[in-house]
């Protein structure tokens, strides 16, 4: 087990609060992000180049701005929340933080970070484990936002029929209540919140974590749970999973809180699927069967 200083407290008090990172409305996309950049330009450093291409577009739009990356969030994103994370993690050697405060505009919230030069072979899961350990060690004890799991759920179910919405809202409440009793072997402290190889980039001779939107104070095991789910689903073989665990110094499979974290992830997946179907104009004919599973959340 890694020698981590345990976070204060022995139980989690997950927050129910307005969503700081809402999902975008249907129709929002690259054109809005470019318009947001133009509106934000007077507030950005002069060295930030005009976007030359799109690096990614889904719940946010990521633009190639030469030596910088411009990430644009949909309208309604809490710029203060983003700034709180990047200010607290300022100077990090394990993660890439924003260069300037977030700039809210009518078309979206604009952030800028340095561009991590692409190159080299894909990051391995062993490197992810090592990068995550460095991140936890470096950022332990920092005043990051309280964890707010499933914060996107209320907005996404608000237009469902009342009975359907109530099933998912009740499931969320049950899971949040159960989380208050979770005990952690690794401590309650700073987590990355969205661990995957796609959020770890090669940076010179080392690697760096990116996409810090979900940084929060939570059981550190939460950051290990995604790898364990990939292993248990067959997406990751045993040798790869073991390499991740060895690099971090801990295997989460024996943790009593893991089944609950799985259910939180499952419900978050339902919320995302509802949004994705609406965003792309697909129907929700799968939802009634899914709701039957959530009448008994645990």
Each language-model region and where it sits:
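All-alpha amphipathic helical-bundle segments outside canonical DNA-binding/catalytic cores
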Residues: 252-262
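Activation segment
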Residues: 75, 118, 207, 215-217, ...
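A conserved alpha-helical element in kinase catalytic cores
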Residues: 69-111, 117-137
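Juxta-kinase regulatory segment immediately upstream of eukaryotic protein kinase catalytic domains
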Residues: 2-48
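Active-site activation/catalytic loop segments of kinase-like enzymes and analogous catalytic loops
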Residues: 220-252, 265-281
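ATP/Mg2+ or Mg2+-diphosphate-binding catalytic cores
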Residues: 3, 11, 152-166, 239, ...
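Active-site acidic catalytic loop and adjacent metal/ATP-binding pocket
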Residues: 51-71, 176-224
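A cross-family kinase active-site recognition segment
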Residues: 2-3, 119-169, 186-188
